[in-house]
Amino acid sequence: MNSVHDLGGSEGFGSIHPEPEDIEPIFHNWWEGRVYALVRMLGLFGLWNIDMSRHARERLHPVDYLRNSYYENWLAGLETQLFESGLVTMEELLEGIAKGPAPKELRERVLLPSDVKNTPLVRMSYFRDT
């Protein structure tokens, strides 16, 4: 079943104007890298996997999904996962303030550079060969 996230072959969405590859930044705004890092870090901690993360983004309302930027959809998916996993309450999300500490087992985890380097999805370069 196709949804709003799978527009391959669909008409009526206008032309696509990608940025030239030689000047396209990895992240367009400072917060995008943080969202990406949080999603990946919490995945490394075993709270969810890449399929669960994608599913959270794909469940966004179609209007929001199409209106949002790529990393705005990642942020919305992250918020959904944090709430559904019980790590945050809706009140905490809305106010942007934690009402208490994170679970002890998460506070005690330390993510080392070697943990990140040895993760299959980040072994590759994010830069394109030119």
Over which residues does each language-model region extend?
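A charge-rich, low-complexity, intrinsically flexible signal that marks solvent-exposed coils, linkers
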Residues: M1-T130
